[in-house]
Amino acid sequence: MSDVEERINQIIQVLREQVVQDTAVPRNIRRAAEQAIEALMNKEKEPAVRAADAIAILEEISEDPNMPLHTRTIIWEVLGALEQIK
């Protein structure tokens, strides 16, 4: 497994464990995180394209006023990691 694929898998794990499975996070935000995970898992596209798709989804929800602060921080960290994927 390449370094990029390993990084993508780590990002998927963070989203799954800290956002999707957190019941304190509103449902629409968990759903967007699931969509970002699906975009990252799409092996038909290049890693950079998958990362860009996930960034678009996560940026859209990152300013949601209903998002808990700890979740917003996680989303920002994930966005930073995704932006490094080329």
Curated annotation (Swiss-Prot):
Gene3D superfamilies: Ta0600-like
InterPro entries assigned: Ta0600-like_sf, UPF0147
Domain of life of the native organism: Archaea
Disulphide connectivity of cysteines: none
Signal peptide range: none
UniProt cross-references to SUPFAM superfamilies, sorted A to Z: Ta0600-like (SSF158436)
HAMAP family, sorted: UPF0147
Family: Belongs to the UPF0147 family.
Name the record gives this protein: UPF0147 protein PYRAB16980
